[in-house]
Amino acid sequence: MKSLNKLCIGFYGTSEFSLSFLKELFSQNIKISYIVTKPPIPSGRGKKVNISPVHEWGLKNKIDVLTPADMKDRKFLDYVKKRKIDFNIIVAYGNILTKEIINIPDYLSINVHASLLPRWRGAAPIQRAILSDDKETGVCIMLSLIHISEPTRLSA
């Protein structure tokens, strides 16, 4: 395995939660080849088109930002396949990755989920834990495998 400062990753994330992970990876001198985030959406009273916090950060740091509407889009897949990456890091992205994307890195695809699985699977685990007055919560780090319902937990 390469040393940390020689690693190259593809990062998939959208939220403020995922941005904290992205910033930490960047601070460790891990090369971020590209960022994949949800497409900009109109919101608010004026229906202004807003980009995600991850998208904004990527642009400020001159990292390629991709916003595919379809994870099976040929142009998107060709782009990410051409980039030699060691890992995919997925943190609160908002879409399920295809088998093809999961298998792109030389090593692994790793998913970070903001709950102690299986308690709050799916979207908004932090909000659901708060609304349920959970006394204990955490983060799970797992391998992303072909069958998303059967992750292999690396850490909790």
Region annotations inferred by a language model:
Residues 1-149, 153:
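One-carbon transfer enzymes
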